[in-house]
Structure formats: structure tokens, C-alpha cells
Amino acid sequence: MLKPQIHKPHLVNKLPLGTPFIPSHASIASFSTTSLRTLSVQKCYRRYIRYTSSNIKAIMPDSIGKSIRKKCVVTVQPTISGALTAVTVGLLGTVADSVSDFLGRSFLLELVSSDLDSSGKEKDTVKAYATYDELDKESKLYKYQCEFEVPDDFGEIGAVLVQNERHRDAYVKNIVLDEIVTFTCDSWIHSKFDNPDKRIFFLNKSYLPSETPEGLKSLRQKDLESLRGNGEGERQSFDRIYDYDTYNDIGDPDTDSDMARPVLGGNEHPFPRRCRTGRKMTSTEPWSESRTTLPFYVPRDEDFAEIKQITRGATTLYSVLHGVIPALSSVLKDEDKGFPLFRDIELLYEKGVDIDPPPDSGTLSALPRLVKAITNSTKKVLQFETPRIKHKDSFSWFRDEEFCRQTLAGLNPYSIQLVTEWPLMSKLDPEVYGPAESAITKETVEEEIKGFMTXEEALEQKRLFLLDYHDLLLPYVNKVREIEGTTLYGSRTLMFLTCTGTLRPLAIELTRPPNNGKPQWKHVYTPCWDATDXWLWKLAKAHVLAHDSGYHQLVSHWLRTHCVTEPYIIATNRQLSKMHPIQRLLCPHLRYTMQINGLARLSLINANGIIESSFSPRKYSMQLSSDAYAQKWRFDHEALPADLISRGMAVEDESAPHGIKLTIEDYPFANDGLLLWDAIKQWATAYINHYYPQAKLVESDEELQAWWTEIRTVGHADKKDEPWWPQLKTQQDLIGVVSTIMWVSSGHHSAVNFGQYDFGGYFPNRPTIARTKMPNEDPTFEEWEAFMEKPEDVLLNCFPTQIQATKVMAILDVLSSHSPDEEYIGTSMEASWEAEPAIKSAFEEFCGRLKKLDDIIDSRNRDPILRNRTGAGLVQYQLLKPFSGHGVTGKGVPYSISI
């Protein structure tokens, strides 16, 4: 039996170093702006005494036989202090951990053999204590060292067990033996005082379950079980448990009955599942989980707050939510006050808004782009950068052609669809919602295209396109109209594809369902030359833009990327071992998302949060997202080619470059996206075919099958019986599933996220709410006279209020920003990929394709023929350029949903 032995130490004097361990288990939401002051060990004793790396080693008793000495280095990443934590380092913890270093007991490591012994049992582990050695000045990482005496017959080392002897958890980057054998950890290791279980880390070599070395099989299963939990109790900050729950925590009925919200997830309101936290239920609603207090729970390895730069998205988002928004609310106290003049909107960029910093004003230090100090004053100014849409052309938002162009090359390219049937018909019950047939007629179309062709020819030649928010919004119109300060319609917007390949609008239909004895009201607006109808047309566009903004945020963005991805993350951690090749392929695409989603539930999508207070559906926003999930979401349509085909924006064509032919040739999002999709799929194909050379390996992989089953039946339980779920029997099945997940977390999310400030930062271009009804809907004499007297005032009153606009602008600025340490797709190679030559080569080819894509997009943006992506004053389409600098750049595709 191997026993650790402590040799007589060599005393070495060292200057005290800041501890590499965090002061508390703090998720992102525990951020304070108070600067963290680390208490120096020097206050306890004047000299730091440590053991050299040769002091502590595991030795073999002489009677056992020969052994090999192996040197081990443990690399620990320091945590970020300052604005990232609310708790200063406690003296007790500092002294206790320093004593651990003094005694040479920082980490207990145990090497595990991949082989069984001659009797078929697992071999004894080889143990050693690692103690602090130095701070690497170049990498700024802490090094701990020890030596092992490994028996000659130990066999190949396959895993290492780690126990953290300190009182605080530590983020361990890697463990290296003899500078050759590497265990990539990138994981928080809890203190044994919080959890006595040892952490398990495997070599960088990937194994299918059937190929697992005999000596590691039980550890592989044990490690998975440690991540699943038992579904009971409240999760603690040091836990690594991944489990499922419904969205039963966005309401706050204990504070106010009007803040109660229905549970999302279940037969009544289908929705993907989130990570379970186990908090107690509310006292007023036993089915609703109580609102969280800071910090909120995410599995420990999903919390990157203390190890990423201060400008990491979650940090800055937190700073806006808990620093800027309260400051704005204290200044803009009249919640109903709009902008009296367009000039007042301009001043947001020229002068900004003076704000009183909150008591904990350090949060604002994370926002140098937004918040500027005022000379000789304690006040600060919230000054917005001019968005590109306004900087390039101040009047572009007013033009019809730009209104249409942005459906192809703007922030929400996921809604436009081909018209395939005429007349346009609603699928809603006419007994409840009124006549189903649209008021946009054949004559309307022919009048607008001025005899260029008949309506039948336009339909046959695929010239008619639609934004259709009629059936999704109409059931909410009467309910939303009961809320003061907002209104809603069902809407349809019809567009025509011109001979130059651009779109122009033909008509907008706004509909109000029957209510309180009033019949259905609907009206068709068209581009006009006379003053009155032209202003009605502009107001109708404002309503449609508010609908599109809401759909973009609640469906294209939140639902189809953030929300549906969380079950993928949970299932991947619960069912795929850390040594599984698919786990390692997906890992970079699944980082950071759960932390962002937790913050969204805390302050963005919650009752009376940013979304509910600033978007047209108000308190019904998340129910609308649930309806979209029930009616529209299909996994098999989330791959880009399938999405385009489902909307009629492409047809299958084996002779076309991507296997599909676009209905609109100059569709910037689709053209760039298909190149990125192909690159992702080719990378996934090479990777999967390497590990699964035969189809039977896919079907017989019990971890893989359990993973896919759990995604379908638990993570997306409300869709579990749908016939469209792909099977997982062949390599092609697996390539399709994995490529879709990789695309959604990278390309899809980037396309709908990183242009938010460029397009929405000037809110007349994308208002989030329409506050007033159309002037011609049952007008009073006074209302109509006010419109006729000064229609500009009516438009400004329809736009968001000052507090609504500035809150959203501040949020969009952060959501659109890349951090300096952003991990762009194809720019960093996972250690497990590099360890396998064939995978390393495939990844390098993937990187090469992405670099070509970057150049291709630049070339396309210089082509004057492509009018939908370039032209005088246009914001060129570059959202799918893979690489970017930091800040708000309007380009760059991170691996994952990192903000």
C-alpha cells in the first residue's frame, strides 16, 4: 500500500502572494461594485514559509519492488478580484489556507491506472500531496508541485483523483506529469470541507463507452453520477449538479399578486426546461419557486465570473441591470414621458443623461463605453455611442426599402417567408377572432405593382413575401390593451421582390379582434403620396417594427438560442462522460450559457423585468414565447438549410453549392450563414467519422443514446412525442444533430445578437413597443384632430418612453459587445482535439475555411451588384464574419452563447 511520507523540509523564505483561491462561492449575480481588498497573509506573520517541491512525495515500500519517479505540476488560475465579488477575503480563511501550504497539504492527488491487476480488480492508486511552488510571471498562473513514486507494473495512467485540502475552491487549469501526460481540468475543485468527494479527471484521450479501459470504467460511471444529483434539496454554490425544472421562477407572487406568472413547461404552456435550483416554493403559490437572492445557483463549472476578464458579458450585463437601470429610474421618474422632439433623441448621443451613481457605484466602472465621469462633479453621464444605422444615414430608418432590406440583412432575418397560398388566411377560430381571410386582396397587390404583372403571376414567380405576426399576436390583443401604456394588433406585412433583387413593401394589415360587443377591426395600409395616408403608413410601419422587435427578442433570440440550448447543456453533462468524444466536441459551444440564462431569469424575462416593462406584449411576453415554442419550434428545422426551406426561402437542389437554392439570391444572412453552416458540418463530419467509423457504433453507444433520449423526453418534454425528432442510428444522424446544436449556439445566436445596438440602438429604427393605437381606429374627434395637426407628435407618442428607450439601449449596448477574451469559433483548439492527430488536422482545415469565409464576406460587401448588403449609407452585412475585435463591432461569431 502506498503511503505519503513527509521528509524533513528545506525552509524557503518567500514574499507573501495573493491567494489563488476565491473568497466565497459567488455566481455572477453576486457581483458588487465594492473593490475587493485582499487581506495579506503578511498581517499574520511576516514571512511566508513553504516546502520545496521535493519535500512531499509518495514512496514505495522497499518490499514492493521497483518504481519510477514522476514529477507533477498542478496549474491553478488566479481569480479576478475587485468588482467581481461582494465578500472580501476573510482572515480565518487566509490563515487556514496558508497553513495548508505551510504543511505541504494543498491538494491530495491520486494517480489511477487504466489497467486492472492480475486478479481483475482495480489497482491501488498512487498518492501525493501537491504544495505551492510559484507564480508563473509570464502566464500569471500559480504552480503547485509534487512527485510520485509509480510502480513499474502500474500500467498506463488514465485518471487522477484530486482533493482540495484548502478551505476555498480553486480553478485548476491542468495537471501535467513529467511535462508529457496532461489532464486538462478547466474546472472548479471544491474544498473537502464543503464536499468530501474527490474530483475525477481523465486523460485528454477520448473514448467511446465500449472502448473505456477496464481500470477506468467504474470511475467513468461514478463521475457521471456525481453530476446528476437526486432531484432533492436546494443546490449549494459549490455543487456541480445538473438537473431539470420548469420555468416556475419568473413570477413573484409573494411580493404582489399582479406579479404572479404561469409556470412555463407543461401541457398548458409548453417550454424547454431549465436547470433545477431547488429553492423553496412561494407561500402564495405552491407551484411557483421563490425568487432568488444573490448569488443564484448554476453548476459550479458554469460560473466563469472569477476567472474571466471584468468585461466578460455577464459581468457587464449585471452592471447595467444593477447599476445603470436603477440610476436611470431615479432620474427619469415620469415613466410615461416620451420624447417631445426628435432632437431630444439626438441628445442621447450628443450629451447623454446625467445620472447619480448608485451607492455601490463600482458597478459602473465595468462600463467605460456607456458611463462617463463628469469633471469636478460626483455625477456621471450615461452617454450612448451613435449606432451605425444612424451614423451611416440618419434617415435610413424612415425609408421603405430599408424597412424591407433589414428582413434579409438586419437583426431578425428569421421571420420573412415566401407566400405560397392565396388569399392569406388565419388559422384561428373565426367565432372568436373574426373572419379568417385577410383584407389584403389581389386588387391590393396589383394596384401596388402598377400592372407589372398579375397577382397570380407574382405568386407563381415567387415574388411575394410576408412577415406574418397575425395568428401569434391576435390572441393577446385584447389582454394587452387592458394594460395602460401599450397596445397591440395582429399584423401582416406583404412585400414584393423587384427585378433588381430588392424588396419593396406592398401593404400592411393591422387587425383587432372582436371585443366588448365591437366587431373585428382590420385595415390595410399602403405606401402613399398624399400626406395623411403617408403618415398613417409610417405609423403602421412603427407598429410592425414593434412586433418584429418583440418576436426577435422573445423567439428568434431568447427561445431559439438561449432557451432551447439549456437542455442540451444539462443532458450533455448528465449523460456524456468527460472522456466522451461528443462531450468534448460540444464543450466549447456550451460554455457560459447557463450563467447568462440565470441572469436573464433574474432581471430580464422576470415579472416587471426589462422585457415586460419595455416590449409591447408586456406581462404576456413569456407566454407568447411559450406559444411560439408550441406552434413553431422543431429541432429538425433548426439547422440553417432546413430553416430556410421551411420558410420557403430555399428549395432543395443537389446541383447548388450547399444542396439548396435560395428563393432570393441576394439574401445576405442566408448566403453567409450557409458557408458557416457548411464549415461547421464538415468539421463535425470529420470528427464523428473518426470516432464512429461504423454506424453500429452510434446505435450501440449507451451514453450517446441516453443523451439524445434525455434531450427529447426530459429537456424538451413537451415535444417528446413529436414525429419529427431525428433518430440516432447512423453517422449521418449524429452529424445532423451535432451540427445543429453547434450552429444554434454559434451562427444563429451571433446573427440575432451582435447587431442589436447597431440596428436597435437608434430606437426609431426598431421600437420595442407601440404605445398608442392607430389614429384611424375608432378615433375621437380630438384624436383625429391632433393627428391632422401634428402627425410627428403622434409618432413620437407611439414610440417608447424615455425610460423604456434608454433602459433598452443600455442593455443592447452590452448584449452587442464582445469581451477582450471572447472565444471565437475556430480560434482555439481544445486539448483533447490536439491530442489526436487526425482531429487536429480536421480542426486546422475548419480554421482555414473560417478564414476564407471572413475574406468572402468582405468581398461580397464590396460588390455593388449585391444591393441588399451594400450601398450608399447602408450598414453592410457582416454579422457572420467569424472574427472580431472586442467591443461593439457588429461582427464576430463566438463558439457559444456567451452573452
UniProtKB/Swiss-Prot annotation:
Localization annotation: Plastid, Chloroplast
Chain segments carrying region Disordered: 252-286
A biological process term (GO) from this entry: oxylipin biosynthetic process
Main location: plastid
Transit peptide interval: 1-57
RNA-binding as UniProt keyword: no
Source organism superkingdom: Eukaryota
Positions contributing to Fe cation binding: H557, H562, H749, N753, I899
Tissue: Confined to glandular trichomes in flowers.
EC id: 1.13.11.-
UniProt enzyme class: oxidoreductase
Domain PLAT: 83-203
InterPro entries listed in its UniProt record: LipOase, LipOase_C, LipOase_C_sf, LipOase_CS, LipOase_Fe_BS, LipOase_plant, Lipoxy_PLAT/LH2, Lipoxygenase_dom_3
Domain Lipoxygenase stretches: 206-899
Spans through the membrane: none
The family this protein is said to belong to: Belongs to the lipoxygenase family.
Described purpose of this protein according to its UniProt entry: Plant lipoxygenases may be involved in a number of diverse aspects of plant physiology including growth and development, pest resistance, and senescence or responses to wounding. Catalyzes the hydroperoxidation of lipids containing a cis,cis-1,4-pentadiene structure.
Protein name from the UniProt record: Lipoxygenase 2, chloroplastic
Organism: Tanacetum cinerariifolium (Dalmatian daisy)
Lineage: Eukaryota, Viridiplantae, Streptophyta, Embryophyta, Tracheophyta
Originating gene: LOX2
